[in-house]
């Protein structure tokens, strides 16, 4: 019998095309795997790495201020954010204690036990984030008992997962009882992506506030905005506000420089750019991270947008007693919209045991 060569499927062709395209591009080198780690706990690792980022940044800030230095500082900040984004899932898992929950349906014959130990969580972190590969970290990421849920039957038997083309079933290896298996996902998982984007955007807002947005504003734009202030007979420094700069940029067709409104306002007024201390900037970021889960819990079901960033930073500044910062965060003009944000904010404050200060 003559063997007939198997024809390539469309999937095979697509895979070949993708492989060819990837081979034409120089991919970013990934961190090589090590065999050991200098850290012994997740808490120690996170604190140690954050401190390392801060020390690198401080060393550059204390040196000569050049464009190259600013680019390096910006890269360190991006690396720190990416590190935190990679680490957050393991921090959340680390806080989960070993729990046992009974399946509540009347016809259910199985019990599910979630096994998430601190040791295995740290080992998985080492493998995925620190790139530490050794027998213990490999066991942590491959052993079903540390990753998946363990199902047991009421008779004491262990479950086995049987999968066919139409459904998956849990089958007891002792009494033969069966139950459909349905994977479940937490709301946190589906919203983590948006939370990460918000954290990145907050970092951009804080950079803009301090004139560190990295975009050079042409002198012609500065002159055009300055001319608008002159036309409107605005000359005192207290009246040259970022909100007014944004209004003039829109009028002049320079909306692409919205992120530079603080820099432009400072250049026209002659007031030095605001500088936040590292401690205050870190505190603002920490507070922002803390409100993510409470916001998701208390937001109206149909609401897709997050709270106004100006509103959030305004409320943070109030809580921290940084009243001199309030002028930099203009609030929404509509009382109804402000009230709607206050309603959510009050619930967030209750959850976190923060003082609630009404806006309207």
Swiss-Prot record:
Disulphide linkage map: none
unnamed zinc finger segments: 153-175
Family under the similarity heading: Belongs to the nucleo-cytoplasmic large DNA viruses (NCLDVs) VLTF-3 family.
Single GO molecular function: zinc ion binding
GO biological process, one term: regulation of viral transcription
InterPro entries to which the protein is assigned, alphabetical: Poxvirus_VLTF3, VLTF-3_Zn_ribbon
Keyword list, A-Z: Metal-binding, Transcription, Transcription regulation, Zinc, Zinc-finger
Official protein name in the record: Putative transcription factor A494R
Function: Putative transcription factor.
Protein source organism: Paramecium bursaria Chlorella virus 1
């Amino acid at each position: 019998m003559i063997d007939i060569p198997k024809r390539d499927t469309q999937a095979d062709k697509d895979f070949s095309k993708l492989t060819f395209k990837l081979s034409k591009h120089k991919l970013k080198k990934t961190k090589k795997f090590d065999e050991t780690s200098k850290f012994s706990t997740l808490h120690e690792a996170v604190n140690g790495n954050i401190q390392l980022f801060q020390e690198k940044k401080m060393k550059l800030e204390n040196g000569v201020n050049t464009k190259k230095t600013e680019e390096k500082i910006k890269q360190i900040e991006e690396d720190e954010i990416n590190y935190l984004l990679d680490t957050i899932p393991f921090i959340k898992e680390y806080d989960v204690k070993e729990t046992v929950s009974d399946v509540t349906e009347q016809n259910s014959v199985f019990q599910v036990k979630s096994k998430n130990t601190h040791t295995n969580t740290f080992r998985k972190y080492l493998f995925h984030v620190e790139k530490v590969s050794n027998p213990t970290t490999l066991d942590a990421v491959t052993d079903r008992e540390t990753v998946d849920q363990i199902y047991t039957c009421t008779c004491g038997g262990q479950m086995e997962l049987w999968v066919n083309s139409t459904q998956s079933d849990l089958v007891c290896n002792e009494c033969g009882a069966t139950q459909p298996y349905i994977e479940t996902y937490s709301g946190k998982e589906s919203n983590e992506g948006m939370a990460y984007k918000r954290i990145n955007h907050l970092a951009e807002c804080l950079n803009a506030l301090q004139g560190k947005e990295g975009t050079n504003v042409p002198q012609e734009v500065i002159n055009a905005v300055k001319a608008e202030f002159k036309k409107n007979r605005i000359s005192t420094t207290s009246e040259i506000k970022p909100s007014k700069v944004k209004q003039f940029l829109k009028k002049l067709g320079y909306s692409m420089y919205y992120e530079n409104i603080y820099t432009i306002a400072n250049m026209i007024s002659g007031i030095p750019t605001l500088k936040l201390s590292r401690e205050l900037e870190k505190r603002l970021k920490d507070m922002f991270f803390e409100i993510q889960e409470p916001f998701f819990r208390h937001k109206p079901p149909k609401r897709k947008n997050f709270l106004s960033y100006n509103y959030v930073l305004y409320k943070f500044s109030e809580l921290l007693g940084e009243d001199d910062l309030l002028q930099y965060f203009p609030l929404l003009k509509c009382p109804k919209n402000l009230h709607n944000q206050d309603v959510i904010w009050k619930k967030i404050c209750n959850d976190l045991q923060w003082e609630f200060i009404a806006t309207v």
